[in-house]
Amino acid sequence: MKELAQTAGVENVYVINTCAVTAEAVRKSKQEIRKQKRQFPEKQIIVTGCAAQIDPDSFAEMAEVNAVIGNTEKLSVDTWRGLSNGFIGQTERVQVDDIMSVTETAEHLIDGFGTRSRAYVQVQNGCDHRCTFCIIPFGRGNSRSVPAGVVVDQIKRLVDSGYNEVVLTGVDLTSWGADLPATPKLGDLVMRILKLVPDLNRLRISSIDSIEVDENLMQAIATEPRLMPHLHLSLQHGDDLILKRMKRRHLRDDAIQFCEEARKLRPDMIFGADIIAGFPTETEAHFENSVKLVDECDLTWLHVFPYSARQGTPAARMPAVDGRLIKERAAILRQKGDEKVQTHLRDQVGKVHAVLMENP
């Protein structure tokens, strides 16, 4: 976005890229808008991102906001030309189209990450699944994949530019390829990258859904030392009934089995996971199953979300857990996560690892 805005001649403007994962994220976005306007009243404010895509009117109604643009529009230089100095206020204040009609996701690939030695390549966007708690598909649209050839060419350019590590990212990364000819799998993409970009030192995968992991990805985990031994899993909960109410595609035993199999193939594999505390109807017994899952999967890095009702989602209509109890349960999970991190760090004492300086 920054490069597009600069190319279009946009100046003296604050662009706020919003998040919609939780109600708290939306609140903080609006708080930041008001803060920036107080501190820099002479600057125009343009709002974009998932929260703006999902509920543009709530931002357009703010006196501090000059323009609201959607997730597709923010990737178009023509949008930014229309918002360049002198034109804000003359174009439509809200420019947000139907994200569900978008079928392409390749044109926004980024070539520059400043002084960092790690680069990110978004190979997939959107999600075809409808978990009952999640609003993100309405901000990102349906699942769409970047063709493998485009991904490989992008990574070659990044490696030629000096990047030592590439991270593959996506909203629902393990669904990569489902919309492409011959429906390749994520493992096919990983193997192709490692084969065709031999000078790439490290390849890392961001958050995945373990139930969708394919055989080639498991083979890469077992045989490719350049594939980093760290996987972040979208687990969300440790109780089967809650997982069903979330409309997740896996059960508790599926998660445990995947972690056991992956660690057999790669003994140094480390897992992180997203876990939601206080999902509607969650009892103490349900919650305890999430706590136990941390040990049973031997998770090291926990990303704990206190449940946040998102308007329009099925979960928002389910019987809610008391807010204080949600916070208490989230705190217990975070404490559990802190303990797992400390255990992992103690286990590294005396060991030697090759490391990457992320920002030399």
Regions found by a protein language model. Name each.
Residues M1-W176, M191, N216, L231, ...:
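Proteins enriched for Cys/Gly/acidic motifs involved in redox and nucleic-acid/cofactor modification
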Residues A20, Y120-Q122, R204, L243, ...:
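Short aromatic/hydrophobic contact patches that present stacked aromatics
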Residues I45-G49, I54-D55, D160-E284:
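Conserved SAM/AdoMet-binding glycine-rich loop
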Residues L233, D274, V294, L302, ...:
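Hydrophobic, well-ordered secondary-structure elements that form the walls
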Residues L243-K244, A315-V321:
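Short beta-alpha connecting loops at secondary-structure transitions
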Residues E282, C297-L299:
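Contiguous mid-protein beta-loop-alpha structural module that forms a pocket-lining wall or clamp
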Residues A285-K292:
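Short, acidic/polar
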Residues V349-P360:
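Structural detector for short beta-strands of small beta-barrel domains
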